[in-house]
Every structure is written in structure tokens, then in C-alpha cells.
Amino acid sequence: MKCNTKCDKNGYFGEFGGQYIPEVLKPAVEELKEAYKELKDDEDFQNELAYYLKHYAGRETPLYYAKNLTEKLGGAKIYLKREDLLHGGAHKTNNTIGQALLAKKMGKTRIIAETGAGQHGVGTSMAGALFGLETEIFMGRVDTERQQPNVARMKLLGAKVTPVDTGSKVLKDAVNEAMRNWTATFENTHYLLGTVMGPHPFPTMVRDFQSVIGKEVKKQIMEQEERLPDYLVACIGGGSNAMGLFHPFLSNNISTGNDDAKNVKMIGIEAAGKGLNTSLHGASITKGEKGVLHGMLSYFLQDEDGQIEEAYSISAGLDYPGIGPEHAYLHNLGRVQYASATDKQALKAFMELTRTEGIIPALESSHAIAYAIENAGNMDKDDIMVINLSGRGDKDLNTVINAVHKLGC
């Protein structure tokens, strides 16, 4: 079956996606859709975006051969795409600069965002400061308590941080609150959504801004290995860092020339939390069902009555109970494989990379590293695996120190 990576005019990837929004929000979403349609291919806009990504954010980021980890595991050659080195400490900056610049062009004076781990909140706060936009970040109370360093950074950057005390007080509740705020303020406010979810055009727009990751990897791996990788691996929350890595390798969207992108295996790693046999996980594709939330049709964790269940992960950025619609489509198509890693596996991976390579990964990224630790040793030594190291782990040190002691990792 052909992998069509373009959504239709109504924002559907196959049966997934769409615009499930109240009437009051339709003018805001339509305004955004038309503005993005006009600017995405505008040469001046793209040149300005490229300028800020290079000179402000520090692109391109390195593609690093993890020689020590490769030798220790004894299998596939492991490369790390170093998004942790991007200004702000994670891949989120690619999207926040793009959307904030778009908001500025639309004449908006205020941006709002949801955040879980805090990295998107930090990235949005940075972009707000850069472009002179009033900024408010909605963050679940639970996440504000476990991500204090990022809360402090957001405030330092001039953003208002609003704790959310409804529901389970985590990421999905922050999204709910941000959408409510946008409904009342969209005339002067842009909702800078942080991942490839939500109503059309957000999944496509965020993916496009993040695709710089995969475009660079494609060029860099050809320079270093003279061929494409065998495996691309990324963690999955809502799924933006993974879509950013995967999308340029989906064969109908690139001019492949002599390289054979259709043979590149793509693997997304969800949060298995305390185990997939428990209710404490965030594995929406592995354990979820089709449903509608936050303006889109996708896979969500639900109870028998179709009510959204709480997601759990030791990583604040992976405890969203759903998945972006393009991921749901690629899963159904079989083009991308989805696996999972438990808290304990992620913590072990965090420690392994830190002590083997001297690189401290985010707990989110550690889920992808865990896949390599479990599987790379069984692969051929000529195989090449690229892992998206989506963020740095400074924000997670307190969580890791406490958890490692309890779990004995």
C-alpha cells in the first residue's frame, strides 16, 4: 500500500485526524490554516525561519557516532542525532520558533502553550522573548512539581506559568486549559501547540517545522556512511520528535535518487511505565483504542465506557494518553513499528549513555536509547541505527536520583 504522507483537505491521514472542534473555535483554526498555507512556501518566511534556526537556535545539530556504546553492545552502529544540543535543550525549539514567527506574521501579540516536561514551555518562552510576544504557559500541577528547573526557566524568560489543577493535573489537562483559553482570546492570541496532535493544521504544521531533524540526518548519514541508515528510532509522546526524524525518509516525500528510503525501518518507542500489564503506562498505540480528543481522531487510552484514562510515565513528556494522527495512520499502514520501554528500562538507558558516552539524555529520549540497548546487540555489525536524542537530561536529575535508588538501576 502506498504511504501517502499528505493529509486531505479536511486534515485526515486516512481515517485519522480532522477538526473536532466547537463552532466558536473554527474561525481561529481556519485563520491559522490559511496563514500557514500562504506562508509555508513563502521564500521570505522560510529564509527568516532558517536564519533563526541557524543563528539563534544553533542548527544544524551534530549526528554523533556513539562508538563506546556501539562497542559495548556489540551490534549495530549507533548514531545519535544531538537535538539535546539545540538552544533550549530539546527539539521543541524547532517548532516554537516556527510557530512564533508565524504568529508574528499573523499580527498576534500573545502566545500560549501547554507543556508536560517543560521543554515546550521553555521553547515557547524563549520564542516569546525573541519575538516580543506576551507568553502564558499552562502546566499540570503534578508536572510543575517534578519539573521545577524548567518552571524557573520559563518565569526567568518572562512567561506566566499557570498551574492546572483539574483532572489528573498533567499534560492532557494542560492541553484542555490552553484550548479553553484560546477559545476566549484567539483574536490576539496564537495557541502554540507543542506536538503533532490537535485539530488540522497543527499535526501537519508541527511535523513540517520538526522535519529539519530528518532532513539533516539524511544529509549527515550520507556524508559519514555513504548510505541511509537501517533503523530510525525515536521516543513517542504526542510524537513530534519522531515525525521530525521519520518524515523526510518516507519515500513518497523525497527524491530518493540512488538511496532506498523505503527500506529504512522506523521505530517509535512509547512509555510502558510500570508495565503494559498494569494501568500505569502511556502506550496509546500499543494499548489504546480509536477515539476523539483535543480536536482529532486517533488512538487514545480509554476505559470500557470510552472515557479517557490517565497516562503514566516517569517521563513528564510521555504521559499523554494519545498519539498524533499521522502516527496512527502509519501504524495502521505498517510503515512504522511501535514498541515500548518501561520506567526501569529507561532509567537504565539513562545511566548507560551517561556513563558510556558522557552524554546525559532526557528521560524521554532514554526510552529510545533503551530500545537500542535491548536490540542493537542482536543486529548485524554493518547495520546502522540512528536514534533521535531529543533532549538533555538536566531537568530530570532529581527524578532519576530518587528513582534509581528505589529501583536499584
From Swiss-Prot:
A GO term from the CC aspect: cytoplasm
Keyword annotations: Amino-acid biosynthesis, Aromatic amino acid biosynthesis, Lyase, Pyridoxal phosphate, Tryptophan biosynthesis
Catalysed reactions listed for this entry: (1S,2R)-1-C-(indol-3-yl)glycerol 3-phosphate + L-serine = D-glyceraldehyde 3-phosphate + L-tryptophan + H2O
Source superkingdom: Archaea
UniProt pathway: Amino-acid biosynthesis; L-tryptophan biosynthesis; L-tryptophan from chorismate: step 5/5
UniProt xrefs under InterPro entries: Trp_synth_b_CS, Trp_synth_beta, Trp_synth_beta/beta-like, TrpB-like_PALP, TrpB-like_PALP_sf
Residues modified as N6-(pyridoxal phosphate)lysine: K92
Molecular functions per Gene Ontology: tryptophan synthase activity
EC identifiers of the protein: 4.2.1.20
Named cofactor requirement(s): pyridoxal 5'-phosphate
Oligomer status and interactors: Tetramer of two alpha and two beta chains.
Function (record text): The beta subunit is responsible for the synthesis of L-tryptophan from indole and L-serine.
Family matches, as HAMAP family: Trp_synth_beta
Name the record gives this protein: Tryptophan synthase beta chain
